[in-house]
């Protein structure tokens, strides 16, 4: 009987390990034929993996037939997922694949809840698997630094399996608190339960990962990841050493001197933040401007937001309106850009899902933290540290837009819902649902997953064809390319880069009105002022000079330090017979200092100088 129980436990452990490991390996398979492969390959890989996870979840539910303890974090996740679903059906519109991913991540959450509830050590197996994924990423990163592996971005040497150093550093700092927890927890006393060899193996494994992560993290040059690492590891250390209790005792011993010690600590923190700010001052000022503009975008549609996927368009319009008021400083004009992300997930959620969506997201995370604080399991420190690192990193970056980082976040949320809750009130601990309900729910999740992932092969083929057509687009072969882009439009109309290329093809082939329509759709998705530049040129070709002027001015307001929109506006004035306006605008362009002096800028200024000559 004992051997049978051990065999069952081993089988469960292998199942949990394999299904967890699958979530951390699929993004290494890069299909280079896909357009935007650094993003789309991961997306289509996730579609395949979630199917495997769901089918295995159904099998586990039917084989084990175990009751499921429904907890408050589960309710928080359901509320958030339900709101996204209702918002997509009854709201102003959402980008389809973004809504699908939110729903699929809710399904993944409950699958991981089921897996982590299979047996008591399931949580430990999942956390060790996560650390293994962190080890692989650090080895991959060192391989890139030493030229053994190719980088995921031409401008950066270190990206891991990601497309730039930011998400790579974010992944490592979410793993780091878990590694630190086990470094503190693996001690010689473990020899009694597993022998000296097990202690040495575990100790060497976790300490090796810790040293590797700490060695490579500075090379990523991500200040947000450093802050997240300090916060996450600080939480783990505080829980392990019960620092709160020790600080109280220290305060009693120091008496009034404690205030001086606290003051010195605050000054040190201020100096630290000042150093981080001065390290990349323009970048920090740019983030601050983005947050200000995001706040203005939230004010435009405070409760429901603009819809998932439409952050770029809402941000671009809000930034143009801000610079049009002439309230901005010269530094703000200098650092303004056209970001794809808000670099603060809480503000971006506010822009896309409104205040209601932001509150529901914070509620779900807050309920998970509450569950951890009530837990009596020691692993709560590791999970809470990981959630803390994610939460801090989300203040300065875009982890909810990177599928691997969302998977780690969902894993932490699921583990928080699973960990033992003996300290909770009795009425909360008794909330369970029967095995038949679990099996029915697993079938429902399978049906939803099938509905959301069917026909994705057609979408994948569309991305492959787009990648092929981009070669002809780059060679300025527009006549045939425009017809192929028209065929791809139903599949790729939520991709701003595709809409921009399609709009340009239409413009180059003289289809100006249709080009304006396609580019206008792109302005809902992107903050790139080039959409308005091309629309302005199309309107000018149609002799709609008032519309062209409005487009060029909008592009100029969106990113004020760029000269190209003003150059186009000056040319349009001259071509339309508005010579006086043209001369005024030409002088403005000639006198304006560009952010980066290039041959193109010199040519534009030289051309306008010729226009000014009598």
Residue positions per predicted region:
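Alpha-helical transmembrane segments of multi-pass inner-membrane proteins
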Residues: 12-27, 48-61, 77, 81-111, ...
